[in-house]
């Protein structure tokens, strides 16, 4: 054995079976199996029984495909919170759920039927609905496996499904409350309509895309006016939906806007030369430029009120459109875009509809459910509205009514399922009034009583509720909970009889909602009513009413807690789950079903783009798990600010893998040095050295930071700081400094025991702090070293904090010492890079400072230990000092630092340079004593 290695066997080097090779993708499933074998969930329930409940209500994901990064992130965030609250001592009750009804599933089944050469109407309704149910069940099982794989801790056996009979019955119970208290009415209103899916859509089922449309400028000839100035003049309108011109029944103007009457003198379109047009004064320049009008004369300027009582003719008059088109005053008209006069098609826009109703304009729908003009629509019968634009333009041009056409790029609503554009269409629908029974008022009051995280989300949902229309709760589809209403054929009034409703609900609870849709609903009328007097409503409920009712059949009926402590969903749920739950609960219970609401952002790629197959930038949770493991995915979720949109990609994952390795290395160092066989002998706080107390003070502060993070469920800052603590303050500072004591001091020495005491506390707290995130990894370390008699780290109680550890003065002192150490290290690294030294132990460090406080700190601190050097001296700097390897002046701390090589001998065991080296064994006094003590112990043992 060489002199260099002759004493290696006398060192107390770290030993652990905790490998740096985590092999997470293959090891994590074994941990899940272990949890199942020990019935972990049941033990957690038993341990928490009788404690205060904490309920995070799970907003149901849709059961129509594999989970994606959004759904995985959502469930992981919920799980981190639940596991944290469990450690805090709460009885955490998490019941997962799924949204099972609705259009996306119907769409898939219809597609399957079409692939067989059939259509939906060829299939019995009961069979069709069973296919939908089977499809949902398939994806529920697949998603459940995926959620379990990312360690979501939940009561899977108690999971709720909106298609369960009990759930369907409760949804009907909730609807009946609105219906019987007069909040439900049948109205003829404009709704967002999908021609492809032939149904009304909710705002939450809409996505907006930029499209190019043909915007057109159209003339409406003035027929009647009290003012002769308008004789033979025309009103000019602008629209981006030419297909709605056949539905025009009026024109809207702003009473206080400024208008002018122009005479067109020269134009690229010779057919309009000489015509007189009315247009908003502020828009003359823009319109004439767009339409190629080169010369014009202003005949008159006037206020909009002069347009009152004017009657126009439809551009397609004499071709079936022989009706009056009145000018109507409206407060929504402005002069920022268009012509300052709006074409009104009452059936195809909300403002149009409301203005038509106010002025007794006939509301006539000329479009079928599938988006095709009805047979009695002159000129355009049988055409699809989206294919009619060019035909409408052609017909207008033929009648000299077209002034200009311009391509117009704008944001337009599309169905999120079919990806096709929707239309606004006035149809008979069922609505819940937001004014009846003060529903809007109750909702706004509840919003202000709820804690919103981030706080900006409160303004967002409040604005939505203040401005939203009545809730359209009917859908013209098959897969959902039916609207169980009978309509009197003569009076057209719905039958409001609680006994009838109760009978229906009772049967739905037993047999499901097929009893209405596929059975004989008239049997529920009993002997009290003649079935011949009634017709059955065939619509189903909006699926958002389903999910909005989950609080009733989950929080209440599963004996959880009402209201829930927390709802947590993506930012899109302000118009979805958050709002439907709010309105449903306020309408039936006068208050929100939640105390606090957390909103998280969308998951984007590393460049901040939305993930899509077309861009090839989709990152799936399954791919991350196969590549890096679920613990790494959870670490990403914990370190990311969820209040904003979150990014993920290859580079981000590479960084996360590095973060994970550093955390793992922290535990490897701890396990290697405290041993895995027994608990270390802990030293009393008063007997610890300052540097050890400093680490305890840091633990105390992290304990407080964690409490603050829990109060507003904002964990990313805590875990970022904790990661930095592990990688910088521990690995690169405390662990590095402690190696000499751990490896070279006597095994039972006070100094070494002080270090293992700190490592023990670090292990105990870090395991608790990281267990909600790195669920598998913490289980792995716990199996190797248990601080308490618990089968699983997740059964481990949170360690107790000692108030003695709080020491802000000590923290400030050591923050200053760390700055000094950093300055010293920069000199050491400079000397090392210049190949003047190999190890810092070859050096002695000198400091000259005028700062008395700093001088005092340095005199009372073992700087040799802190800087891992062989000598430290406080001296006055002189430029003539010899053998200086490197020099630095640190202005911030008022000091000069220089280093030189030590001239002392080397201890071949600890490698420190010491004045007293034993010539016989080349050891320093400390190492000689340690070896002698070991020899004496060995002799006694023999």
Predicted regions and their residues:
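Residue patterns forming the tRNA-binding/recognition surfaces of aminoacyl-tRNA synthetases
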Residues: 2-17, 21-24, 30, 34-38, ...
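Protease-associated
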Residues: 246, 250, 257-344, 350
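Alpha-helical recognition segments enriched in aromatics with Gly/Pro capping
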Residues: 331-333, 359-371, 477-479, 498-645
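Short Cys/His-rich micro-motifs in 6-15 aa windows
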Residues: 925-937
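Short functional micro-motifs and their immediate structural scaffolds
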Residues: 202, 534-535, 912-918, 932
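Short cysteine-rich clusters marking metal-coordination/redox-active sites
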Residues: 194, 415, 488, 526-530, ...
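Acidic, turn-prone loop/beta-hairpin segments
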Residues: 99, 191, 195, 201-209, ...
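N-terminal catalytic cores of NTP/NDP-binding nucleotidyl/phosphoryl-transfer enzymes
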Residues: 46-109, 171, 237-239, 243-244, ...
């Amino acid at each position: 054995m060489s002199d260099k290695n002759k004493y290696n066997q006398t060192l107390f080097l770290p030993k652990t079976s905790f490998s740096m090779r985590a092999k997470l993708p293959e090891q994590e499933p074994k941990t899940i199996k272990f949890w199942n074998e020990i019935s972990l969930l049941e033990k957690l329930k038993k341990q928490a029984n009788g404690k205060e409940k904490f309920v995070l209500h799970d907003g149901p994901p849709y059961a129509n495909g594999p989970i994606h990064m959004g759904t995985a992130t959502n469930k992981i965030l919920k799980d981190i919170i639940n596991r944290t609250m469990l450690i805090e001592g709460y009885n955490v009750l998490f019941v997962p759920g799924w949204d099972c009804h609705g259009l996306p599933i119907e769409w898939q089944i219809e597609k399957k039927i079409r692939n067989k050469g059939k259509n939906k109407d060829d299939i019995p309704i009961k069979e069709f609905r069973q296919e939908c149910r089977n499809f949902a069940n398939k994806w529920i099982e697949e998603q459940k496996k995926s959620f379990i794989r990312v360690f979501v801790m939940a009561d899977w056996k108690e999971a709720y499904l909106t298609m369960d009979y009990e759930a369907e019955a409760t949804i009907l119970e909730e609807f009946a409350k609105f219906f019987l208290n007069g909040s439900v009415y049948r109205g003829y209103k404009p709704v967002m309509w999908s021609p492809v899916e032939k149904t009304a859509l909710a705002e939450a089922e809409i996505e907006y895309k930029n499209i190019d449309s043909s915007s057109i400028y159209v003339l409406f000839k003035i027929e009647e006016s009290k003012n002769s100035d308008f004789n033979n003049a025309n009103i000019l309108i602008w629209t981006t939906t030419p297909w709605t011109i056949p539905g025009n029944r009026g024109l809207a103007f702003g009473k206080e806007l400024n208008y002018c009457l122009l005479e067109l003198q020269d134009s690229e379109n010779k057919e309009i030369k000489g015509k007189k047009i009315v247009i908003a004064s502020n828009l003359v320049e823009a319109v004439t430029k767009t339409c190629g009008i080169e010369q014009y004369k202003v005949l008159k300027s006037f206020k909009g009120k002069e347009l009152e009582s004017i009657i126009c003719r439809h551009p397609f008059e004499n071709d079936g459109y022989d009706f009056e088109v009145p000018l109507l005053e409206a407060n929504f008209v402005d002069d920022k875009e268009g012509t300052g006069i709006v074409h009104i098609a009452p059936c195809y826009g909300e403002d149009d509809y409301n203005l038509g109703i106010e002025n007794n304009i006939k509301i006539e729908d000329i479009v079928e459910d599938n988006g095709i003009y009805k047979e009695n629509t002159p000129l355009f019968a049988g055409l699809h509205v989206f294919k009619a634009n060019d035909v409408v333009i052609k017909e207008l041009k033929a009648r000299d009514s077209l002034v200009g056409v311009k391509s117009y790029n704008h944001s337009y609503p599309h169905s999120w399922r079919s990806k096709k554009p929707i239309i606004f269409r006035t149809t008979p629908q069922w609505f819940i009034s937001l004014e009846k029974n003060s529903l809007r008022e109750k909702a706004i009051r509840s919003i202000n009583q709820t804690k919103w995280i981030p706080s900006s989300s409160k303004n967002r949902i409040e604005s939505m509720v203040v401005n939203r229309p009545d809730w359209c709760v009917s859908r013209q589809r098959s897969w959902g909970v039916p609207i169980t209403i009978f309509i009197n054929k003569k009076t057209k009034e719905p039958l409001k009889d609680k006994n009838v409703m109760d009978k229906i609900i009772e049967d739905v609870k037993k047999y499901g909602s097929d009893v209405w849709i596929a059975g004989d609903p008239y049997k529920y009328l009993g002997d009290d009513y003649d079935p011949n007097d009634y017709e059955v409503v065939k619509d189903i409920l909006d699926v958002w009413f389903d999910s909005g009712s989950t609080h009733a059949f989950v929080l209440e009926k599963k004996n959880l807690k009402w209201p829930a402590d927390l709802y947590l969903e993506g930012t899109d749920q302000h118009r979805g789950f958050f709002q439907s739950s709010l309105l449903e609960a306020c309408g039936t219970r006068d208050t929100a079903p939640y105390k606090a609401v957390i909103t998280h952002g969308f998951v984007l790629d590393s460049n901040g783009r939305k993930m899509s197959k077309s861009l090839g930038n989709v990152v799936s949770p399954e791919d991350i798990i196969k590549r890096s493991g679920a613990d790494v995915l959870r670490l990403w979720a914990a370190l990311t600010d969820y209040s904003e949109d979150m990014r993920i990609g290859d580079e981000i994952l590479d960084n996360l893998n590095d973060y994970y390795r550093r955390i793992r290395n922290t535990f490897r160092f701890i396990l290697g040095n405290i041993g895995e066989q027994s608990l270390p002998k802990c030293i009393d706080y008063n007997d610890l050295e300052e540097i050890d107390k400093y680490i305890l003070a840091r633990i105390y502060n992290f304990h407080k930071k964690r409490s603050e993070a829990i109060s507003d469920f904002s964990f990313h800052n805590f875990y970022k700081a904790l990661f930095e603590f592990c990688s910088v303050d521990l690995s690169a500072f405390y662990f590095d400094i402690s190696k000499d004591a751990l490896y070279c001091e006597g095994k039972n020495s006070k100094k070494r025991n002080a270090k293992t005491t700190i490592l023990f506390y670090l292990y105990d707290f870090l395991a608790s702090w990281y267990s909600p995130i790195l669920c598998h990894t913490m289980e792995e370390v716990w199996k190797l070293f248990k601080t308490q008699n618990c089968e699983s780290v997740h059964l481990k109680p949170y360690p107790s904090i000692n108030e003695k550890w709080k020491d802000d003065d000590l923290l400030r002192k050591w923050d200053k010492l760390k700055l000094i150490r950093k300055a010293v290290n920069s000199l050491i690294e400079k000397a090392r890079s210049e190949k003047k030294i190999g190890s810092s132990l070859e050096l002695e460090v000198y400091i000259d400072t005028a700062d008395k406080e700093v001088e005092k700190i340095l005199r009372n601190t073992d700087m040799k230990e802190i800087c891992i050097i062989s000598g430290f001296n406080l001296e006055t700097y002189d430029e003539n000092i010899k053998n200086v390897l490197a020099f630095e002046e640190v202005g911030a701390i008022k000091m000069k630092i220089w280093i030189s090589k030590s001239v002392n001998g080397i201890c071949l065991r600890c490698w420190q340079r010491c004045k007293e080296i034993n010539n016989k064994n080349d050891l320093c006094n400390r190492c000689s004593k340690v070896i002698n003590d070991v020899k004496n112990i060995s002799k006694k043992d023999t």
